[in-house]
Amino acid sequence: MTRSYEKSKQAYAEAVQLMPGGVNSPVRAFKSVNMDPIFMESGHGAIIKDIDGNEYIDYVLSWGPLILGHTHPEVVKAIAETAAKGSSFGAPTYTENRLAQLVLDRLPGMEMIRFVSSGTEATMSALRVARGVTGRDKILKFEGSYHGHGDSLLIKAGSGVATLGLPDSPGVPADVARNTLTVAYNDLEGAKAVFEKFGAELAAVIVEPVAGNMGVVPPQSGFLEGLRELTSTHGSLLIFDEVMTGFRVDYGCAQGYFGVTPDITTLGKVIGGGLPVGAFAGTKKIMEQVAPAGPIYQAGTLSGNPLAMTAGYETLSRLDRSTYEHFKQLGDQLEAGFREAATKYNIPHTVNRAGSMIGFFFTNEEVIDFATAKSSDLALFAEYFRLMAEEGIFLPPSQFEGLFISTAHTEEHIAKTVAAFHKVFAQLAK
């Protein structure tokens, strides 16, 4: 039976008169899948419901933050109790201490942390700190990696920028862009060449230890280690953008999983439990350069607000090492089911995984960087997305975004998803 999206269509027609493109973040417009966005109403566990009453198994999870699934009862209870006491004070609260300690305990190389209100704020602040500490201006990032919408970072970016086919953004001054150098992800030799030419001018390398905004692209062997060596040799800082990978890839984040310690880590998503949050952390020597301890300025009205700190603490305190065994078990089943169905119906495919992040690509080429990610059949992906939605499976509406698993997902959810793969691929093969 074909699902009705009539109320979503009406809501979108109204929204486009009120907000640019009808949304408050570009990827939500569903442009790359050639349909109007689906407006959501509620979520419980791994299931969400749209305003037309259609239900879905959710693999978007608000683009990653909801690692416990939707409306976890203990998290909801804690948020409500905190809200009843006050949503923000403009003064410190002890919950900031609790979340800070919890995060730092799981990141042994990080000694101090500053909370902000978004991942973009975290990466922008991390770059300012790196430039302030080193006295240098240039940075190196990787093509297709998305680090938020700060001017310095909207150069050959992924995520919604890639989805819309915009390699850069108008409004980024040329004087800013010239200080951002780029090479392909996983291209250590390219990074070495940049350092040979600009090593004395490079403040930092910023990298997703697992790229998550060109699909899911893990680092090849030696890539992160090589960046660590390059930055240390040339007096630059290594920034791991773990806004997406933080507590998704492993209990100790991607840096713990791969055994490479950066100078600065940026975080977001999971550490806010579904509320707006970001953070940057580093060694005490670096972080004590941040105001008011040091001269590098950073501030925020709602930074460390009680609601986000409470949601983050209640979420992280419910993750232990067994959580990631659960993710691996379900991820194995989901990957095997996708591969089996795609192979059965001769659908070109590649699967990349890292912890509870999974990337399905419609290409037979190994996906190791943005160029190979773009070899995926985008028209096929769009049809796949629409048909999976009809089967009650909600996926990211972009080839360049990964799927997420939560603790609320079960083997039954995975089995239903795999059954949908078979049904949809049978239709695509006709």
UniProtKB/Swiss-Prot annotation:
Compartment list: Cytoplasm
Cofactor requirements of the protein: pyridoxal 5'-phosphate
Record EC number: 5.4.3.8
GO cellular component: cytoplasm
Disulphide bond pairs: none
Recorded family membership: Belongs to the class-III pyridoxal-phosphate-dependent aminotransferase family. HemL subfamily.
Database matches in InterPro entries: 4pyrrol_synth_GluAld_NH2Trfase (IPR004639), Aminotrans_3 (IPR005814), Aminotrans_3_PPA_site (IPR049704), PyrdxlP-dep_Trfase (IPR015424), PyrdxlP-dep_Trfase_major (IPR015421), PyrdxlP-dep_Trfase_small (IPR015422)
PTM-bearing positions, type N6-(pyridoxal phosphate)lysine: K269
Coarse class of the protein's main subcellular location: cytoplasm
Associated pathway: Porphyrin-containing compound metabolism; protoporphyrin-IX biosynthesis; 5-aminolevulinate from L-glutamyl-tRNA(Glu): step 2/2
Main enzyme class: isomerase
Catalytic activity as recorded in UniProt: (S)-4-amino-5-oxopentanoate = 5-aminolevulinate
Coiled-coil portions: none
Name of the protein in question: Glutamate-1-semialdehyde 2,1-aminomutase 2
Quaternary data: Homodimer.
GO molecular-function term, one example from the UniProt record: pyridoxal phosphate binding
GO BP terms, alphabetized: protoporphyrinogen IX biosynthetic process
Pfam families reported in the protein's UniProt record: Aminotran_3
Keywords for the protein's UniProt record, in alphabetical order: Cytoplasm, Isomerase, Porphyrin biosynthesis, Pyridoxal phosphate
